[in-house]
Amino acid sequence: MLYHENFDVIVVGGGHAGTEAALASARTGQKTLLLTHNIDTLGQMSCNPAIGGIGKGHLVKEVDAMGGLMAEAIDHAGIQFRTLNASKGPAVRATRAQADRALYKAYVRNALENAPNLTLFQQSVDDLIVDQDRVVGVVTQMGLKFQAKAVVLTVGTFLGGKIHIGMESSSGGRAGDPPSIALADRLRELPFRVDRLKTGTPPRIDARSVDFSVLEAQHGDNPTPVFSFMGKREHQPRQIPCFITHTNEKTHDVIRNNLDRSPMYAGVIEGIGPRYCPSIEDKVMRFADKNSHQIFIEPEGLTTHELYPNGISTSLPFDVQVQIVRSMKGFENAHIVRPGYAIEYDFFDPRDLKQTYETKFISGLFFAGQINGTTGYEEAAAQGLMAGLNASLHSQGKEGWSPRRDQAYMGVLIDDLSTMGTKEPYRMFTSRAEYRLLLREDNADLRLTEKARELGLIDDARWARFNEKIENMETERQRLKSTWMNPNSAGIDELNKLLKTPMAREASGEDLLRRPEISYSDLTQLDAFAPALEDQQASEQVEIQVKYDGYIKRQQEEIEKSLRHEHTKLPADLDYKDVKGLSNEVVAKLTEAKPESIGIASRISGITPAAISILLVHLKKHGLLKKGEEE
């Protein structure tokens, strides 16, 4: 049966990737359909109740700068906000927030239900309609056919999902939800490389059964940071603490004595789990020298007693889970509300994607989220937004767009996935970015909002506020450049108290702000440089841009230099064994990958900057560099 109306874009799945994909497509004016197996689970946090963190917070800020929802939703649902790495440089500072699951999900659903150009429909998808290597629609579980110019699959852990608790396993997309078997089988018929991954979740605990008096409280920041560019502290709900406990030798003995009942160690689970979020049994075995592991006790919300013990993800049998939990300080009488479990699922090699998230084999078909081998809400949201945007552009017959590695962590994400692929669940870290001084949380809007406006993702209110901030920054920098003090100026005594050595010659406000011992707040408390900007976002940018000016310029020069060789062609018949100085490992990797350009070669795992320099010397020596590429 054919549905009575057609769509420009269909998004399959209503998780963090699917919601951003659907909203991005709808925001650009395309008639969009979001299909989900259950409308009540839209925006659900299937694992930990938190948004952000190192690298991840950067992605959330970028999604926000592109008009996405995640930052706005967590600002309305966050029950504890913190800035991580606050004492370090701005490049690695990151925002993280605990979420009230119910508030977060309700905010997301409300945004979806009220979005213009977006239709919701509750049905699982069993099949794709493909016409000569071009997707033209989908078929739902009840045989209903929907037609569209582009389809975005954001199916999370549902493709062939299998849940494990001890040696018992069952089919499922997550606890309480059925898997997507028919669609998984259909996708396996297409020319994609497919494999299995695994993730897991800890048991949930009833807070009323925990002795908090013996736990260490962990409070949020005051004042609280805000995620969204348009966010306000008054949007945030009541703030509450998290708590910390630890595993101990008793915990570890329980785990070691029951490894034969672990599906992971018994070989029942084939999928590879996330390296940076291992199960507790994996941690105990991999770090055998450690006597304890820190466990963060995270509230699931303001109106529930459920706790999320971050750090004891497990697939051990339920009776062992009870022993593990009750071995920890404060949890001697703990009651488990929901058992922990592991889940295996299909993912598709992201090297079969273009940089727009469109698949190389099926035109108009886009993948986003865990289907691409990633882990994490933030990584999913970033992919979803970009896939939804590019599906919209495809449906309009326009060229796709993706940021470069030097423009956004979103660019690092798709570039890593599409050039290197992944064998384990991929998560974002600031260390993955070569130009992280330029890719800060605080300047996500400056990097991306103008382009997002051009692409139709930014509304008038945000655009006006963005331009106001730019104007405030430019005016303030000009004021500081043109305001001077000398050793005889009024107020010099107050200034000298701030300086390591007394002022010896005339200096502008900008000169003084470059000094590490003087902050913008210090400077603008002096009469000569008062008043401070009321726009705190603008004043923060002024301070960072002035203090890091030299480093920023140096990194921009590095980018310009690297871009000169980004598209330098590598001959298809180049025999890498003839390139003197390359290691056998590098020769083998380049021979297998056959990269088309220096830029692609540079991003193959294991190809070092030194190897790229050797390649450039070889190309120059044999006259294979074009004019302008030889520097």
Curated annotation (Swiss-Prot):
Needed cofactors: FAD
Subcellular location, principal: cytoplasm
Source domain of life: Bacteria
Disulphide bridges: none
Transmembrane stretches, start-end: none
Subcellular location: Cytoplasm
One cellular component term from this protein's GO annotations in UniProt: cytosol
Binding positions for FAD per the UniProt entry: 13-18, 125, 180, 370
Amino-acid positions noted as binding NAD(+) in the UniProt annotation, renumbered to this chain: 273-287
GO BP: tRNA methylation; tRNA wobble uridine modification
Pfam families listed in its UniProt record: GIDA (PF01134), GIDA_C_1st (PF21680), SAM_GIDA_C (PF13932)
Quaternary structure (record): Homodimer. Heterotetramer of two MnmE and two MnmG subunits.
Purpose: NAD-binding protein involved in the addition of a carboxymethylaminomethyl (cmnm) group at the wobble position (U34) of certain tRNAs, forming tRNA-cmnm(5)s(2)U34.
Family per similarity comment: Belongs to the MnmG family.
Protein name listed in UniProt: tRNA uridine 5-carboxymethylaminomethyl modification enzyme MnmG
Gene source species: Vibrio campbellii (strain ATCC BAA-1116)
